[in-house]
Amino acid sequence: MSGGFYNVECPDCENEQTVFGKASTEVACAVCGTTLARPTGGEADLLGEVIETVEAR
């Protein structure tokens, strides 16, 4: 994974949310608040299932 954007599915409520691959802060699900991404100093640790990579326009 590089520093792109990913559509990640929340493991608790199945909400699909776009997350930056190198997030520097924790990213929570907008619906239920479950952590979807945790920063690691480089690429974020994506905790939900990656549905797809968002392509650049």
Curated annotation (Swiss-Prot):
Name the record gives this protein: Small ribosomal subunit protein eS27
Classification of source organism: Archaea, Methanobacteriati, Methanobacteriota, Stenosarchaea group, Halobacteria
Cofactor annotation comment: Binds 1 zinc ion per subunit.
ZnF C4-type span: 10-32
Cystine connections: none
Assembly description: Part of the 30S ribosomal subunit.
One Pfam entry name: Ribosomal_S27e
GO cellular component labels: ribonucleoprotein complex; ribosome
Alphabetical list of InterPro entries matching this protein: Ribosomal_eS27, Ribosomal_eS27_Zn-bd_dom_sf, Ribosomal_zn-bd
Keywords for the protein's UniProt record, in alphabetical order: Metal-binding, Ribonucleoprotein, Ribosomal protein, Zinc, Zinc-finger
Cited HAMAP family: Ribosomal_eS27
Protein family membership: Belongs to the eukaryotic ribosomal protein eS27 family.
GO terms classed as biological process: translation
Keyword GTP-binding: no
Cofactor dependency: Zn(2+)
GO MF, any single term: structural constituent of ribosome
Positions of Zn(2+) binding: 10, 13, 29, 32
